[in-house]
């Protein structure tokens, strides 16, 4: 919007309303279409401006922690910075867990914490804490804005600070940005004469054309230097081509274009003749026909020592897969490792001989010659092992009539509608997806919070992913659900569809798989943390439909089709001890395989 339309969006009643409306208009021109606001008095000028802007949807959320994870889900879905507003005091502290997740996993958030002016700090004015650099080193950038003042230079300063904050949330790599916003009274949109020195600007019909002319939405992403044709002449490419015992590790990934990502990995694998060990949280398993060298059962295959499968070189795409067996194998084999990740972070917890290459796989694949390398004996060993393990695993799961949490992950890959966004909760669900999710071509879009791997904020993040998106499914355990049950309040504002598959095993099933499970009586209350919540009543309290699913056939009917609008909970009762025993038995079976595969 330009000209007179823009003029009508600036609120000249007082300095705070003008400050807020310039902030909102600048954000709108940068491309902002949705913001999350938490109630509070000190933040009223920001909330009012965002709520009044015709091109920004300001979504209210009472619980700041839930609101922040909701904004994180919106950022995952839109890949744009999401403004997140709160009042002064402890409110901003509740944003911290989601902000850490955004920093660790690389999602853009623009946190706006309203604050009291300097003269009301450190004097017990009430609802006041030290908010400057509240989030430590986690933000991409952080600053405290100046107090609103009645001069053109101050207005231009505000505009440019918002532009810079938006850009720093996106470049050079996405992440959170924090602006602390001090405001004096009046906080309500009442005329007080404070903008009188600016009346000449208000009356100037050309003001908006000149003031906002430099505010444009950033187009495209800044790519690392190197160009598209560098790879085939780079020294690392020559070293890769000289290795017959190499593997590509595809860890958790949420690329903007999953098919392009899958095609790039396949091109690299074919050119080198290397197998691709693909994590269940990678899109590769859902574009399986693109890559004949895809390996999905590596966790089972590596349960025992298998030197025939040990690589000499590894290309690691981003973070390592979750698999403990894989990590133990890499720690033993100590392969030469090449980390492909544009972020300047140490992503090698094994401390192997690793070289960091600051590129994305799409860039590397574009610079290598097309073609297919000769299939080595090492590649053939991996492919034979995968074929046998995949067939046996599929048979075991297909023949299983009762509920088993691992089968649910396998079953969803066969039954979810194509291209369904699937949010996968941390703890047991992500591991079952890695262990059991089969290769397929349904182009399902996995979403997850694997920056810090916690169970906090799962419901709220899933609501954000589902907002104005395709019908979305959340796969979660009972403790993750309860940990964020305050997020159920978001159901009343959801524009979209979210189906929650609630695995209720009455506690923390992941601990049944750990050595602590053998520790004796302290295990149940302190680790398994059993619960007896009536989820039907909990859902009823929030006006959310709840249904207990008893059979696989009933589940298939409930998911075909997914509803176009609304929230519902489908609860599945499982036995965490029996399921843990089954997983351990299957792992034991594979660990006893002979080393000559």
From Swiss-Prot:
A GO MF label: magnesium ion binding
Family: Belongs to the TPP enzyme family. MenD subfamily.
Record's protein name: 2-succinyl-5-enolpyruvyl-6-hydroxy-3-cyclohexene-1-carboxylate synthase
Swiss-Prot/TrEMBL cofactor(s): Mg(2+); Mn(2+); thiamine diphosphate
Binding note for cofactor: Binds 1 thiamine pyrophosphate per subunit.
CDD domains attached to this UniProt entry: TPP_PYR_MenD, TPP_SHCHC_synthase
InterPro entries linked to this entry: MenaQ_synth_MenD, MenD_middle, THDP-binding, Thiamin_PyroP_enz_TPP-bd_dom, TPP_enzyme_TPP-bd
SUPFAM superfamilies: Thiamin diphosphate-binding fold (THDP-binding)
A Pfam match: TPP_enzyme_M_2
Binding partners and assembly: Homodimer.
Record keywords, A-Z: Magnesium, Manganese, Metal-binding, Thiamine pyrophosphate, Transferase
Reaction(s) this enzyme catalyzes, per UniProt: isochorismate + 2-oxoglutarate + H(+) = 5-enolpyruvoyl-6-hydroxy-2-succinyl-cyclohex-3-ene-1-carboxylate + CO2
Function: Catalyzes the thiamine diphosphate-dependent decarboxylation of 2-oxoglutarate and the subsequent addition of the resulting succinic semialdehyde-thiamine pyrophosphate anion to isochorismate to yield 2-succinyl-5-enolpyruvyl-6-hydroxy-3-cyclohexene-1-carboxylate (SEPHCHC).
Enzyme class at the top of the EC tree: transferase
BP terms from Gene Ontology: menaquinone biosynthetic process; phylloquinone biosynthetic process
UniProt-listed Enzyme Commission number(s): 2.2.1.9
Pathway(s) the chain acts in: Quinol/quinone metabolism; 1,4-dihydroxy-2-naphthoate biosynthesis; 1,4-dihydroxy-2-naphthoate from chorismate: step 2/7; Cofactor biosynthesis; phylloquinone biosynthesis
UniProt xrefs under HAMAP family: MenD (MF_01659)
NCBIfam families membership: menD
């Amino acid at each position: 919007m330009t000209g007179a339309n823009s003029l009508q969006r600036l609120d000249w009643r007082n300095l705070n309303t003008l400050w807020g409306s310039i902030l909102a208009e600048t954000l709108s021109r940068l491309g902002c279409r949705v913001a999350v606001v938490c109630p509070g008095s000190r933040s009223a000028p920001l909330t009012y401006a965002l709520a009044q802007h015709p091109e920004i949807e300001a979504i209210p959320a009472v619980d700041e922690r839930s609101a922040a994870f909701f904004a994180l889900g919106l950022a995952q879905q839109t890949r744009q910075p999401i403004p997140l507003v709160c009042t002064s005091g402890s409110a901003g502290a509740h944003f911290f867990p989601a902000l850490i997740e955004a920093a660790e996993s690389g999602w853009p958030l623009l946190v706006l914490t309203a604050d009291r002016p300097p003269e009301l700090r450190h004097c017990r004015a009430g609802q006041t804490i030290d908010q400057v650099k509240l989030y430590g080193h986690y933000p991409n950038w952080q600053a405290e804005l100046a107090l609103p003042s009645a001069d053109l230079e101050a207005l231009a300063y505000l505009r440019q600070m918002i532009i810079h904050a938006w850009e720093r949330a996106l470049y050079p790599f996405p992440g959170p940005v924090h602006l602390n916003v001090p405001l004096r009274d009046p906080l309500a949109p009442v005329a007080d004469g404070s903008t009188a020195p600016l009346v000449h600007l208000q009356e100037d019909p050309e003001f908006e054309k000149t003031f906002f002319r430099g505010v444009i939405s950033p187009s495209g992403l800044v790519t690392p230097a190197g160009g598209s044709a560098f790879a085939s002449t780079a020294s690392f490419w020559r070293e890769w081509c000289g290795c017959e015992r190499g593997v590509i590790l595809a860890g958790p990934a949420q690329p903007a274009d999953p098919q392009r990502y899958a095609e790039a990995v396949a091109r690299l694998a074919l050119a080198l003749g290397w197998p691709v060990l693909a994590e269940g949280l990678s899109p590769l398993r859902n574009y399986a026909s693109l890559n004949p060298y895809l390996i999905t059962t590596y966790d089972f295959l590596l349960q025992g020592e298998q030197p025939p499968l040990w690589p000499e070189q590894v290309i690691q795409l981003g973070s390592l897969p979750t698999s403990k067996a894989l990590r133990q194998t890499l720690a033993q084999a100590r392969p030469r490792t090449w980390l492909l990740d544009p972020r300047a972070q140490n992503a090698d917890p094994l401390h192997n001989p690793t070289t960091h290459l600051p590129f994305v796989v799409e860039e590397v694949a574009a610079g290598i010659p097309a073609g297919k390398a000769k299939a080595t004996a090492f590649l053939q060993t991996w492919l034979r092992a995968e074929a046998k393990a995949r067939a046996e695993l599929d048979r075991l799961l297909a023949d299983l009539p009762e509920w088993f949490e691992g089968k649910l992950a396998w079953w969803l890959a066969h039954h979810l509608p194509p291209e369904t966004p699937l949010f996968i909760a941390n703890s047991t669900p992500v591991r079952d997806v890695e262990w059991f999710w089969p290769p397929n071509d349904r182009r399902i879009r996995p979403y997850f919070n694997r920056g810090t791997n916690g169970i906090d904020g799962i419901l709220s993040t899933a609501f954000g992913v589902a907002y104005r998106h395709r019908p979305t499914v959340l796969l979660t355990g009972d403790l993750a659900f309860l940990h964020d049950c305050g997020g159920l309040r978001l159901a009343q504002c959801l524009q979209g569809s979210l189906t929650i598959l609630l695995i209720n095993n009455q506690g923390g099933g992941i601990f049944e798989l750990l050595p602590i499970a053998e520790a004796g009586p302290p295990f149940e209350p302190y680790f398994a943390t059993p619960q007896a919540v009536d989820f039907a009543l909990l859902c009823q309290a929030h006006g959310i439909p709840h249904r207990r699913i008893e059979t696989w056939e009933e589940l298939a009917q409930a998911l075909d089709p997914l509803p176009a609008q609304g929230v519902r909970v489908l609860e599945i009762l499982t036995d965490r001890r029996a399921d843990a025993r089954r997983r351990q038995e299957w792992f034991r079976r594979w660990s006893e395989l002979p080393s000559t595969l």
